[in-house]
Amino acid sequence: MTKSVTVKDLKERLNLELICSETGLERPILTSDLSRPGLELTGFFSYYPEDRVQLFGMTEISFSEGMEPEERLKRYKQMCTKRTPAFVISRNLEVPKELVAAAKEADIPVLRSRLKTTRLSVYITNYLESRLAPVISMHGVLVDIYGLGVLITGSSGVGKSETALELVKRGHRLVADDNVEIRQEDEMTLIGSSPAIIEHLLEIRGLGIINVMTLFGAGAVRSSKKITIVVHLENWDPDKHYDRVGLDQEKTKIFDMDIPKITVPVRPGRNLSVIIEVAAMNFRLKNMGYNAAEQFTQDLNNLIGHNSSMND
């Protein structure tokens, strides 16, 4: 099913002034891309992106003011198609009466903002990308640990929720438990959040459902977080080789993005919350340019080389 946002949603989110065509506020917006219709004002419509929000700034309005009224009306009528969601005017500029007339005839809303064109463009794009981003649901727990979004995955009963509870007690923040909704806002960003019905809730076997915000306060939860790393919990397999140095970096694919992944084997006596906490800190350290595993390997190779030269 194609996701969409209505012009009314955009108007309310950005507090835009409605100039005309209130009945057209339910028109759908299907793309986050915007159009600055400069070439269209000159009569070039071969590649007119009619399905985009049409954004007018100082340049477009000033150019149209130099046109004859009949020509101006003709161009605006050409811009008004069945797929055109809305016209948005920035800087509180005066809206050409020909645009109002053409938009009224086609029942296309004309909106106005006091913001400068560039800033308004950023706000509209960010809002539409967030609302129109593809979404999937994953079984797991998302926790904000030292500013990193850590997605904890694993089979049912492996201890994900219990680990998240311990992390919350250690001062970190819960984003979602059991069902994590992940949306891809752009090519480099995955945002995780919780379905509204289970937001701030944590299920602990033997204890039941608890409300983390009620128990630990508003500082123990957050509504969404960018996913930075995946920690996969699995029952200890004595026949499986686990990385003991940390040179190898696993990846897991979410949508079309490769996310760093750490596999942590679970068995009695291992403090999973501390291990995951340290994994997050170590990941931050790697991003800052220091890799303990690589440093150890380099020091070991230097020592071996030094001993070899001494023996020679």
Swiss-Prot record:
It catalyses: [HPr protein]-L-serine + ATP = [HPr protein]-O-phospho-L-serine + ADP + H(+); [HPr protein]-O-phospho-L-serine + phosphate + H(+) = [HPr protein]-L-serine + diphosphate. The active site is at H139, K160, D178, R244. Residues 202-211 are annotated as: Important for the catalytic mechanism of both phosphorylation and dephosphorylation. CDD domains: HprK_C. Residues 265-270 are annotated as: Important for the catalytic mechanism of dephosphorylation. PANTHER family: HPR KINASE_PHOSPHORYLASE, PROTEIN YJDM-RELATED. Catalyzes the ATP- as well as the pyrophosphate-dependent phosphorylation of a specific serine residue in HPr, a phosphocarrier protein of the phosphoenolpyruvate-dependent sugar phosphotransferase system (PTS). HprK/P also catalyzes the pyrophosphate-producing, inorganic phosphate-dependent dephosphorylation (phosphorolysis) of seryl-phosphorylated HPr (P-Ser-HPr). Both phosphorylation and phosphorolysis are carried out by the same active site and suggest a common mechanism for both reactions. The Walker A ATP-binding motif also binds Pi and PPi. This is HPr kinase/phosphorylase.
